[in-house]
Amino acid sequence: IPYELALGWRYTRAGRATRRNGFISFISGVSMLGIALGVAALIIVLSVMNGFQKEVRDRMLSVVSHIEIFAPGGAAMPDVQRTLQEARQHPQVVGAAPFVSAQALLARGEDMKGALVRGIDPVREPEVTDLVAGSQGEALAQLVPGEFRVVLGGELARMLGVRRGDVVTLIAPTGQVTPAGVVPRIKQMLVAGTFDSGHYEYDSTLVLLHHEDAQRIFRLEGPTGIRLKLRNLHEARSVALDLAGSLSGDLRIRDWTQQNRTWFAAVQLEKRMMFIILTLIV
């Protein structure tokens, strides 16, 4: 029997001999119970926080790609097809899709909200996102070039009071230059449906439309970037470094941890503080 176990067993059963030994046995039992409860609390709290982090991360990655490749300044990428081919050559890359990213205002009557506009390719989007499941996938399938249809985040649709079949006004900051100044470009868009990712930041701001329609509205010659999906999301940092050295052209690369750096840093800090506090209790 190990020495530690033999010693602990001796003191926990010491109450059979004398009253003094019984007191020692009581103190030993209380100490062991306190340590057991402290360790249990430490394990439970860290497990809950790890589960919370994983759940939020999974919901976030249903909208955010593992890696984004984009041109600086929000400009169109010089050679999208070439970059797609080069990115797919990496063994960790299992999906790639072009996108357009821009900011705009979305209006319905007197209500107006700021929005993050993302132009997507509905055919390739299933390679990099989980938004194509169920009715959300049916809505994305209606994003046909030239039809100027949009799919709104569920919370954004509720704030504007719109639903499928309604018309909203998209106001782009890029417009025509006139003697009176720059006139914003205004386009009427048909709501094809909504999506709910479970992440408020995206559900309240994100607008999806076909990337060719987005290029016309924002006067771009092509997509502004490419989104990638990896076999192992935890390899995103190393894959991004590999691609930075192999891709042609002046491009920027960021992985999913960099896109949400503030949130993940806050969660990690909270986990460390809880671990320290519970360790002191134990």
Where are these regions (language model features)?
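Hydrophobic alpha-helical transmembrane segments of multi-pass inner-membrane transport and secretion
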Residues: N21-N50, Q268-V282
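Feature of multi-pass inner-membrane transport and sensor proteins
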Residues: I1-S25, D250
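Short amphipathic alpha-helical coupling elements at transmembrane boundaries
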Residues: A6, R10-A14, K54, D58-S65, ...
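Membrane-interface junctions
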Residues: A14, T18, G29-M32, Q89, ...
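Structural motif
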Residues: N50, I67, P91-A97, L160, ...
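Membrane-interface junction motifs in transport/secretion proteins
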Residues: Q53-L84
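Mechanotransmission and gating elements of multispan inner-membrane complexes involved in transport
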Residues: T174-G175, V182-M274
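A structural signal for hydrophobic secondary-structure junctions
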Residues: Q81, Q85-E221
